[in-house]
């Protein structure tokens, strides 16, 4: 693949992201070509047309085709980001460089963690807090103790509304403390004391009261902040773990 007596200025089409590069080249392809002979377009000023064709088959970019005739201009497509090194050229290098840095697609929503949806009967909506800075006024909120003076969102523990899975050892929670529903606040069954919250988040299992009622109930979590109530429906009791 050799070009005799024609300028590369004809028919050069640069792709998007590339620019035309005009540089004078003074490398003759063989002895005698610089003295008015018909020069060959070679790669890096090489020797024979065979070498030129082989080099072009290896994927050499056209910007390394140099003019053998002094005074001709090398017109090629050079990428704006970098200049290619013929010694380190790889056939796929231009492909990856043309792609550039991948940017996130704004049309595709990012997989953000969704807020946990409470099970049926695990939380009941209360009066919205005076300041809804966190945006939790429309969701499930829990009323704190009087000395806490803050509102906290109620989160269900892992598991369905029927309670913990049977395969989980946490299904049988130790009954360290049990409190019935307060008559003043029937929707608030029990409070997570500071003693349980110091070691981390603790779980509260709300269980149905009455004769013949099963031990399966709705599991909710107490917040790590002290003085947060756990939601239970009326006629339920809470068992701390």
Curated annotation (Swiss-Prot):
Residue spans of biased composition, Polar residues class: 49-58
Bias-annotated ranges (Pro residues): 106-118
Region of interest (Disordered), ranges: 19-59, 101-139, 152-182
Segments of skewed composition (Gly residues): 34-48
UniProt-recorded name of the protein: Putative uncharacterized protein KIRREL3-AS3
Designated gene of the protein: KIRREL3-AS3
């Amino acid at each position: 693949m050799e070009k005799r007596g024609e300028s590369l200025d004809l028919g050069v089409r640069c792709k998007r992201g590339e620019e035309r590069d005009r540089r004078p080249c003074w490398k003759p392809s063989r002895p005698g070509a610089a003295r008015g002979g018909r020069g060959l377009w070679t790669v890096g000023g090489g020797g024979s047309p065979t070498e030129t064709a082989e080099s072009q088959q290896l994927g050499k970019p056209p910007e390394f085709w140099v003019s053998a005739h002094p005074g001709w201009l090398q017109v090629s497509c050079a990428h704006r980001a970098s200049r290619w090194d013929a010694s380190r050229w790889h056939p796929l290098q231009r492909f990856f460089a043309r792609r550039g840095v991948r940017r996130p697609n704004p049309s595709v929503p990012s997989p953000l963690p969704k807020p946990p949806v409470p099970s049926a009967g695990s939380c009941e909506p209360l009066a919205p807090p005076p300041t809804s800075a966190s945006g939790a006024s429309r969701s499930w909120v829990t009323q704190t103790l009087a000395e806490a003076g803050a509102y906290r969102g109620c989160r269900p523990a892992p598991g369905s509304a029927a309670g913990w899975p049977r395969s989980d050892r946490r299904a049988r929670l130790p009954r360290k403390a049990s409190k019935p529903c307060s008559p003043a606040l029937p929707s608030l069954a029990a409070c997570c004391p500071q003693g349980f919250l110091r070691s981390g988040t603790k779980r509260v299992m709300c269980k149905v009261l009455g004769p013949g009622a099963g031990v399966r109930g709705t599991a909710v979590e107490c917040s790590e902040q002290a003085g947060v109530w756990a939601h239970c429906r009326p006629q339920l009791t809470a068992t701390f773990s």
